């Protein structure tokens, strides 16, 4: 794994910012997720400081990741989530950041703080080895995806780390395909924008 942020701050182009909706107590109590309406997105896109606007697309299916061999005590399984942003906002090697429709391997960009949490919190308390960024790129990941209509198992590979964005990113093409196939009865709402 090559840390793409070594050229600057991260894999993202430096002129972009992430905008999120405020979480309100009333939404929490009602079980609602804060999201931008179409009118809010249209209004935001007309602001003079916005040249381009993209939406974060959340997975409409459950994600479980298995790393290593949990049965042999050499790995673990965890719940995860995926989000996607339009590829034009990702300043990464496109030969690594691509997904072929119908493919069986998902390239992933992880937040660097997740690796730090694993190394300095989880691994140290569980007697597991610390992992470098390069090592994570060599680790075999199995993703188990469970939607409302279908399930799927896929391989995964970490292709970069980010210091600037706090989500688990997958290519937009994969997200569109997986949401449509696994949970066609659900429609993703944008809780964050990239501008």
Stretch-by-stretch model annotation:
Residues 1-22:
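Alpha-helical transmembrane segments
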Residues 41-56:
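Short acidic amphipathic segments
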Residues 56-62, 66-116:
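The feature marks short, hydrophobic/small-residue-biased sequence motifs that occur predominantly
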Residues 23-43:
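Short extracytoplasmic
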Residues 61-65, 106-195:
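Basic-flanked hydrophobic alpha-helices used for secretion and membrane insertion
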Residues 14-16, 98-100, 185:
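Short secondary-structure boundary/capping segments
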